[in-house]
């Protein structure tokens, strides 16, 4: 049974009904509508913690979706799932693909920075100072890009950049 037919909470049902109405009104072709259904089902499964099901839906959506901007959000969500499963290399790959298609996606840039920062902290704790600094520098570059796009967001990253001397800007916002 499709996920849209088994939503049992009010918010999911409301979202599904609204999405179906919008989908019917949009002048999209059949392929685009089908891609959206897979994407919507992927988001619903992801919200329920059903990551394997979400990935299946996202991969199907990717096969059908032609719009670069829409593809970027599918790739971004796949990255989120891989990151939450601790698969950082896969997550980075999907986030990078999302940014390649949509350079105006600060959330993907932030998530890339978070992974590099995490890897830097891990390298630092293992005594690999040079590797840690290189990873921290990568994190800084991605955070700067994210902050330029969304200056009122990522306050902790802004503070980290200032504290570590990796910010050439006095004020981001």
Swiss-Prot record:
Any one GO biological process: photosynthesis
Keywords: Membrane, Photosynthesis, Repeat, Thylakoid, TPR repeat
Keyword Thylakoid: yes
GO cellular component, one term: plasma membrane-derived thylakoid membrane
Localization (cell): Cellular thylakoid membrane
Pfam families: TPR_12
Membrane topology field: Peripheral membrane protein
TPR repeat locations: 35-68, 72-105, 120-153
InterPro entries linked to this entry: PSI_Ycf3_assembly, TPR-like_helical_dom_sf, TPR_rpt, Ycf3/AcsC/BcsC/TPR_MFPF
SMART domains on file: TPR (SM00028)
Gene3D superfamilies listed in its UniProt record: Tetratricopeptide repeat domain (1.25.40.10)
The family this protein is said to belong to: Belongs to the Ycf3 family.
NCBIfam families: PRK02603.1
PANTHER family noted in UniProt: CELLULOSE SYNTHASE OPERON PROTEIN C (PTHR44943), TPR REPEAT-CONTAINING PROTEIN MJ0263 (PTHR44943:SF8)
Role description: Essential for the assembly of the photosystem I (PSI) complex. May act as a chaperone-like factor to guide the assembly of the PSI subunits.
Protein name from the UniProt record: Photosystem I assembly protein Ycf3
Protein source organism: Crocosphaera subtropica (strain ATCC 51142 / BH68)
């Amino acid at each position: 049974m499709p996920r849209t037919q088994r939503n049992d909470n009010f918010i999911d049902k409301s979202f599904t009904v609204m999405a179906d109405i919008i989908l019917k009104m949009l002048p999209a072709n059949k392929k685009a509508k089908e891609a959206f259904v897979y994407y919507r089902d992927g988001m619903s499964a992801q919200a329920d913690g059903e990551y394997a099901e979400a990935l299946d839906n996202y991969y199907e959506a990717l096969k059908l979706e032609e719009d670069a901007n829409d593809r970027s959000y599918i790739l971004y969500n796949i990255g989120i799932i891989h990151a939450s499963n601790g698969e950082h290399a896969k997550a980075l790959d999907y986030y990078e693909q999302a940014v390649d298609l949509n350079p105006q996606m600060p959330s993907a840039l932030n998530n890339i920075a978070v992974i590099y920062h995490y890897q830097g902290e891990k390298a630092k704790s293992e005594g690999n100072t040079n590797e840690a600094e290189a990873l921290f520098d990568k994190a800084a570059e991605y955070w700067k890009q994210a902050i330029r796009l969304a200056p009122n967001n990522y306050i902790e990253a802004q503070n980290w950049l200032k504290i570590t001397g990796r910010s050439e800007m006095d004020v981001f916002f």
